[in-house]
A protein has these predicted regions:
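Short, positively charged
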Residues: 1-41, 47-279
Length: 279
């Protein structure tokens, strides 16, 4: 080390000749390549510990009790679909809205299709939530809208399963390379789930800054306690992706699942609610 340091110090060139004895030493200790054969671009790892470090906040989620959702629906979490195709008369709209039980959202969606109507994604009902979603990606609201459609019509609720369906549908019309090599849809969903876990709410302006929540203490079905924290962001995001699902909230409470007229146009709203798997 002293020989190398002296040679570097004395040279004014970027390339320095290896001092006598250095090559022999490297051969003796069987070091033949000084360049790391890995994608890890770090030089070394350091952990800092301090008694002055501030306390950090954690949320508790337990499969043994009530599992509070990551996103608790609400009217601000409604996404709007414009009814296009056939123009329905008022009696037809009334017939559609009266179809099935109150929570038979899929039944009313299918009836619209049978009668020649098309539900085309339009917008997020709440402007604050729209902006929050656009912080993930400008096209992310459309992706969520298609995931909601798949949940209701195909009965898929797990986030990982919904993403597999979305990769086949490709609602954003992106290139296959982005879908499969870059895992675009998985990446965007993980970003969103992390934002929800760390404080994003539909009706509160989100600027990308995390709240006081630093992670989850998760109690599994056997009573084991697992810790997920934003310091290990990839592990946390993977956990959320595998263990999250879309849920159905109350149609009456959150005002969705029916054709509603706005400025002469009919819209059909779907509600976004996301929770953790109970099993």
């Amino acid at each position: 080390a002293e020989l190398v340091f002296a040679a570097v110090k004395e040279s004014r060139e970027n390339d320095v000749m290896s001092p006598d004895g250095v090559e022999e030493f490297l051969d003796e200790v069987a070091i033949y390549d000084l360049e790391a054969k890995t994608d890890d671009r770090t030089d070394f790892y350091v952990a800092f510990y301090s008694i002055e470090a501030p306390l950090v906040g954690f949320c508790v989620r337990s499969r043994l009790g009530t599992m509070f959702p990551l996103l608790d629906g609400g009217r601000a979490a409604n996404l709007k679909f414009e009814q296009t195709g056939v123009k329905f008369a008022t009696p037809t709209v009334n017939k559609i809205n009266a179809f099935g039980e109150e929570d038979d959202v899929a039944g009313r969606m299918l009836m619209i299709e049978r009668l020649g109507g098309i539900l085309k994604y339009n917008d997020v009902a709440d402007k604050v939530f729209r902006s929050n979603l656009c912080m993930i990606d400008l096209h992310f609201p459309r992706m969520l809208g298609e995931m909601l459609r798949v949940m209701h019509l195909d009965g898929i609720s797990k986030v990982s399963g919904l993403i597999e369906a979305i990769k086949q549908i490709n609602p954003l019309k992106i290139k296959d390379e982005l879908i499969h090599k870059h895992s675009y849809y998985e990446y965007k969903m993980k970003q969103f789930l992390m934002a929800l876990a760390l404080g994003m709410r539909p009706a509160k302006i989100f600027n990308g800054i995390d709240s006081a929540i630093s992670g989850f203490l998760f109690v599994d079905g056997n009573g084991e306690i697992l810790c997920y924290q934003k310091a290990d962001r990839q592990v946390f995001a993977d956990f959320l992706f595998v263990n999250s699902r879309f849920e159905k909230s109350s149609t009456e409470k959150d005002k969705y699942g029916y054709l509603e007229r706005e400025n002469g146009v009919y819209y059909f709203k779907l509600n976004l609610k996301i929770g953790l798997l109970k099993r």
